[in-house]
């Protein structure tokens, strides 16, 4: 891959669902306006909530807004995940939220914080 400002097939790797990943230093992860910039790797959207929830349980604490793996609204070449609600990836926009792992949503994403 060659570094460039715009995402593209020669500049950006994709996830298993053919959506671009993002390695960046920003605060666009977890709860909206997380505040602190961190190096992070975003999975991109398009991942089923059951898969992203299981990934979080395997590598972190299993909760979308705590730990080193958190929910992310970021989207590049895919549709952005829906904001927290009963039909979205997470139950609420609060630290105590959980993944909506059984609702069948197929458009979720996460971010690994470094």
Give the ranges of each region predicted by the language model:
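Low-complexity, acidic interaction segments enriched in glycine
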Residues: 1-114
């Amino acid at each position: 891959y060659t570094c460039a400002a715009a995402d593209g097939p020669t500049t950006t790797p994709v996830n298993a669902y053919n959506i671009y990943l993002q390695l960046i230093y920003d605060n666009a992860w977890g709860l909206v306006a997380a505040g602190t910039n961190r190096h992070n790797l975003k999975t991109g959207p398009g991942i089923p909530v059951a898969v992203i929830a299981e990934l979080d349980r395997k590598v972190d604490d299993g909760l979308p807004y705590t730990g080193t793996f958190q929910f992310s609204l970021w989207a590049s070449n895919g549709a952005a995940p829906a904001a927290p609600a009963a039909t979205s990836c997470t139950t609420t926009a609060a630290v105590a939220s959980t993944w909506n792992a059984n609702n069948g949503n197929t458009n979720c994403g996460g971010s690994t914080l470094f």
